[in-house]
């Protein structure tokens, strides 16, 4: 009597064959829907694209080569860009060349800065540090140049001390500016002392810089020759003149801001009671001023009053520095100015203090000024 041969159940065999087919069919349907989503975006049918994604929430809005965000930037399609950001598109997503959406927006030139570059930067600031396969960041494509933290070290012996002091000073400035501009004034539960005024801050900064320069000069007097001592005294006089001009400009800017705030406060009250044209010393930072205390283009402390031509502002900064004969001191001075007017640092530090509708104009001027300073620094190498 022979044993019957084992047989595979018919249902199990059919199930094992159908599973890969159903998985492949599901993947194919999803890819077709994603292609349809991209076609709707390209044709400007944004309502249909949004409805498709609502019916099928599992679709990948970043799928495709180039990705939809890159296509919207290349076509200057601002509505499609806004829709993609609302639907959760990732500005840090890279295409086959390693470019992010910020790379694509930066390549469209100055016209795309406000409508494309700034929304992407606000959504994902960390994407500014992503490099493509050519080793470029979005800031380098815009011509901002690398931040000073990644620049090559100078060969002078005091370069490391200067860098450490600058980083420490920058951290203190950021903390003090947050207090001065009133970020925490709205918290009524913490009654603190009055914040330091802008003029007091600028005077203290000038004093600290002067003390540091005096200390360096005293340390170097023993090793320098008499001709070098004469050159150092001229450089010191130049620095004193620069500090005096900086303090005067800071006081003038503070007076101008004070008058502007007083005018806006008077307009808000409907001229119910007369007020002097200038606020008293206790009205430098009125509490509850709201958006009336935000900067406009003319309120930014430009090197030249009211801004103007970037080349002229850069030339004015260079003219206030050490003479051309002192190459080392002039390079150090230009490095400080490059850090102060670098677009990344400026945007990180002062974005919340500038009117939204003025942000594009201000950042355009800061970018042009930074590029002009970079050219002056390159000319000294």
Curated annotation (Swiss-Prot):
Gene3D superfamilies xref list: Ankyrin repeat-containing domain (1.25.40.20)
InterPro entries: Ankyrin_rpt-contain_sf, NFKBIL1
Keyword Magnesium found: no
Domain of life from the UniProt record: Eukaryota
Any GO BP annotation: negative regulation of toll-like receptor signaling pathway
Subcellular location: Nucleus
Signal peptide: none
Tissues expressing this chain: Detected in different cell types including monocytes, T-cells, B-cells and hepatocytes.
Keyword terms of this UniProt record: ANK repeat, Nucleus, Phosphoprotein, Repeat
Feature: compositional bias, Basic and acidic residues: 218-228, 238-287
Modification type Phosphoserine: residues: 150
Disease tied to this entry: Rheumatoid arthritis: An inflammatory disease with autoimmune features and a complex genetic component. It primarily affects the joints and is characterized by inflammatory changes in the synovial membranes and articular structures, widespread fibrinoid degeneration of the collagen fibers in mesenchymal tissues, and by atrophy and rarefaction of bony structures.
Assembly notes: Interacts with CACTIN (via N-terminal domain); the interaction occurs in a proinflammatory-independent manner.
Protein name: NF-kappa-B inhibitor-like protein 1
Gene: NFKBIL1
